[in-house]
Amino acid sequence: MTVGPRDVRAAAERIAGRIRRTPVLEPGDLTGASVLAKLELLQHTGSFKPRGAFNKLLSSAVPAAGVIAASGGNFGLAVAYAARATGVSAEIFIPATSPEAKVARVRAQGAEVTIVDGYYAEAQAALADRQAQTGALLMHPFDQPEVIAGQGTIGIELDEQIPDLDTVLVAIGGGGLIAGIAAWFDRRVRVVGVEPVLSATMTAALEAGEPVVARVGGVAADSLGSARVGDHTFPIVRDQVDPVVLVEDDAIRGAQRAYWDECRLIVEPGGAAALAAIRSGAYVPAVGERVCVLASGGNCDPATVTS
């Protein structure tokens, strides 16, 4: 199944009243150029992820066993939030390497939490075993068409909030967010992808011509460190995103600090990557180009930004 503007519009209608319409602002002298920022860090749970979680949940027949997901970060929190809001049970498999603060937030939403020794791959394996036993509905963090379409509803808001928009910069992890936004705009607006140099999974896939397993790490690995991009997300990015640029960890940290210094906003590393691309010169807007960066999340320790 491919994802297009009709799917994104249907998702927007489906999740209406469930998610916040997040603001766009011109956040001071962040770049030396006129750049707008879409503040998805102000979304429920602190990231864009509830959009896709709600759309997948509300467009599916949910079995008695409820929903199931593997995530140590924003998606697990979003699934727990969406499940609670719709009266559905949720079990989230979380790697033992995840910060306890994030685990506590998932539990606070009422989800059952299963801690798995190891990393995300081990959590996914444990999830697959449990799903086979229970038949619970799988919620994938980025590679389901319903999730992609839900994330794409950000594009609808951008159309309404910035009608003269030329370009939007979006960070890439597994590709669900940028694929959804690109699917909505369908080349009417330029969509630029941003990856950390140390987690350049989409770049590796584009070079190989297909999704491949890549080494990931760096300051934004907790949100942008998918070792392989999605089978659904890859062709959308390949066909509708140009270019994909790379940013260093120092540039990401600098963008986080700029959000704090200019706007008093706590933006997580993955959420600051789009701004880092402009501040570092990885993407240079043309004269008069109307540009928006997506601040996709704010779930990090404030002390890492403000100190």
Residue spans for each PLM region:
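PLP-dependent amino-acid enzyme catalytic core
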Residues: M1-S307
